[in-house]
Amino acid sequence: MKTTGKKLVIVLILFLAGGTMTSCHQQSSSVTNTMSTSQLLDKIKGGWAGQTIGVSFGSHTEFRYQGTFIQDYQSIPWHEGYVQELMDSWPDLYDDIYMDLTFVDVLERVGLDAPIDSFAIAFATADYNLWHANQAARYNIIHGVKESGHWLFNPHADDIDYQIEADFAGLMNPGMPNSASEISDKIGHIMCYGDGWYGGVYVGAMYSLAFISNDIQYIVEEALKTIPIESTFYQCISDVIKWHKQYPDDWKQTWFELQKHYSEEVGCPDGVFAPLDIDAKINAAYIVLGLLYGNGDFTKTMEISTRAGQDSDCNPSSAGGILGVMLGYSQIPEYWMQGLRGAEAKKFKYTCLLYTSPSPRDRSVS
């Protein structure tokens, strides 16, 4: 990825690495992980590509399946040039990505110690549309409410919003989940609290761990250590892990268990008395459902996280991004890459960022 006229901040990680990246995994400080610059770049690109593929794949199913899953006999469109078609005709589909990139842009312009208000003002005054917790936070920021994401002022605080835009935190902290969580502590509370914030912390940690492990079970379980054990979010994801072990060949049985135990939407006004469930934990569970039952298979992961329903573009986006980091851009199957091609040299609307890979001569900070 690169920008027009400036270098993207995630690429700066590669410069500072001096050809290799060394990570001391913070929860196992005796373990050191080293990778080459080219491997790191491949994984970063894989994360952004997987995220974009996922949100595009689930585009026409989002919230059409509430309290039910998409049957196996129902096909989901995917074809050559599909992402470019969607970027041209439906740019607001990519709200999770343009929020992600807004935060990346602030970090590039202001630095890693950028104050909280720089992130808040950036998305509150942006031209793009927002929904739920993000939109409520935008309203609060514009009207001077400082705790813009707190449940007392934002009825969507437990919604999925930060969870779907926390990818950058893990992508910019390879192998360092605690550092990813520190960024999430600063930014995630602008629009979410409680489960909504925990979801972003968890997703960011999974992205971070995907740089240093090819074991999906490890990534899912280790990332959960960033979440308080007494929280309902922790309990929900822990149950998914338990049910996966109990029903290792039947993701639909685990889906039914989730529906029975965690399908209540008690925060978002749009879902309290309706089948809609945009709560972070149930949708995070569908991310994990795809990752565990997909077990490293990109197609299975996409299919399951999408077919689980509810926010079925954002969930495969998160799952695809995490798996894209683990596998690397070069290992994403051709079936999925055909849909992405043509969009790689196209800017995301509302941003100056695109997917084109930096050439060796771009590797400078001048």
Language-model segment annotations:
Residues 2-9:
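Bacterial N-terminal signal peptides that target proteins for export
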Residues 11-19:
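Bacterial N-terminal signal peptides
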Residues 22-23:
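C-terminal motif of bacterial Sec signal peptides marking the signal peptidase cleavage site
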Residues 41, 49, 99, 104-201, ...:
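Active-site cavity-forming subdomains of large catalytic enzyme subunits
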Residues 60-90, 97:
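Active-site-surrounding "flap" and adjacent substrate/cofactor-binding loops of secreted or lumenal enzymes
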Residues 150-157, 171, 176, 189, ...:
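Accessory "access/gating" subregions that flank catalytic or transport cores
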Residues 291-354:
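Catalytic phosphate/nucleotide-handling subdomain of diverse soluble enzymes
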Residues 355-360:
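Conserved small/polar residues in nucleotide/adenosyl-binding loops
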